[in-house]
Amino acid sequence: QKKDKKDKFYGLM
């Protein structure tokens, strides 16, 4: 799955 980028982005929020 290519969702790690978005996950990290939201994780920073």
Curated annotation (Swiss-Prot):
Q: Please give the tissue specificity annotation from the record for this chain.
A: Expressed by the venom gland.
Methionine amide is carried by which residues?
13
Signal peptide stretch: none
Q: Which UniProt keywords apply?
A: Amidation, Pyrrolidone carboxylic acid, Secreted
Q: Which InterPro entries match?
A: Tachy_Neuro_lke_CS (IPR013055)
The main location class comes to secreted
Chain positions with Pyrrolidone carboxylic acid modification: 1
Q: Record's Gene Ontology CC terms?
A: extracellular region
Localization (cell): Secreted
- Which domain of life does this protein belong to? Eukaryota
The Swiss-Prot or TrEMBL record describes its family as follows: Belongs to the tachykinin family.
Name recorded for this polypeptide: Tachykinin-like peptide-X
